[in-house]
């Protein structure tokens, strides 16, 4: 019996020593294990060689980076971001279907960098660009139905700084889509509605102090604004594509009439919340081009 207990004690001691030996070996292994290599700062080329970005990808990234300033000149803060997002969405869809057209838009963007660094030169180019966008939107349908030849469309592209346009006509509905987003109810209606609600009281209080001609112009301006609001208020989720198109053309025509009537009273436009910069001359939606505008319009 005593011999058995002695043998058990020796076995237990041997097991404990073996366990300690194993734990020590594991600790030594962990200490000797090399630390992981730092992540490489370069991407290893695959079997086909280094990856190259397509010209369309490069042009698209550059275009998205440069177009935001354009929308900042049309809108303030939140609405500028909204317009930028709409533009990027349209351009991403275009890039998937027609990457070469994105490159053409990039050439237009590069043309902006050639106009000079002074403020006057930049403003002239911005005005030119806005007039061109308006012309594309207003005349998109007419151009598509006119059977314009490839040579004529190429010349039109060149007028936009797209020297190597390949004659694809898909740019026209794309630009019309962008303009539809910029002249949408979400963008225009809140500010216009606020002005139209304040306009009657303002007209009544300034009737005696304004020249008759100016008073009549403000009355007409108020009437046109009300018509634009009525167009937006008539929108329904079930509107057909034909109805939406007709409404857009009507809103664009009314906005052009507003431009012809000049600025609204500062007391009204100045009270608008952050959003639309109601500067119709700056928007330059259409109307008779000036000396510089004659070189910008391609229609």
UniProtKB/Swiss-Prot annotation:
Q: How does it sit in the membrane?
A: Lipid-anchor
Q: Where is this region: Docking to the peroxisome membrane and binding to PEX3?
A: 2-56
Please provide, alphabetically and separated by semicolons, the GO molecular function terms listed in this UniProt record.
Answer: ATPase binding; peroxisome membrane class-1 targeting sequence binding; protein carrier chaperone
Question: In this UniProt entry, which cysteines form S-S bonds?
Answer: none
Name the job this protein performs.
Necessary for early peroxisomal biogenesis. Acts both as a cytosolic chaperone and as an import receptor for peroxisomal membrane proteins (PMPs). Binds and stabilizes newly synthesized PMPs in the cytoplasm by interacting with their hydrophobic membrane-spanning domains, and targets them to the peroxisome membrane by binding to the integral membrane protein PEX3. Excludes CDKN2A from the nucleus and prevents its interaction with MDM2, which results in active degradation of TP53.
Extract the Gene3D superfamilies matched here: Pex19, mPTS binding domain
Q: What residues show lipidation of type S-farnesyl cysteine?
A: 296
From start to end residue, where is composition biased (Acidic residues)? Answer: 16-27
Record's keyword terms, sorted: Acetylation, Cytoplasm, Lipoprotein, Membrane, Methylation, Peroxisome, Peroxisome biogenesis, Phosphoprotein, Prenylation
GO biological process: what's one of them?
peroxisome fission
Q: Which residues carry this modification: Cysteine methyl ester?
A: 296
**Region feature (Necessary for PEX19 function on peroxisome biogenesis):** 2-91
What is this protein identified as? Peroxisomal biogenesis factor 19
Organism name? Pongo abelii (Sumatran orangutan)
Q: Which residues form the propeptide?
A: 297-299
Instruction: Give the principal location in a single coarse category.
Output: cytoplasm
- Positions carrying Phosphoserine: 35, 54, 66
The entry's localization annotation reads:
Cytoplasm; Peroxisome membrane
Entry-linked Pfam families: Pex19 (PF04614)
Q: How does it assemble?
A: Interacts with a broad range of peroxisomal membrane proteins, including PEX3, PEX10, PEX11A, PEX11B, PEX12, PEX13, PEX14 and PEX16, PXMP2/PMP22, PXMP4/PMP24, SLC25A17/PMP34, ABCD1/ALDP, ABCD2/ALDRP, and ABCD3/PMP70. Also interacts with the tumor suppressor CDKN2A/p19ARF.
> Where in the sequence is N-acetylalanine found?
2
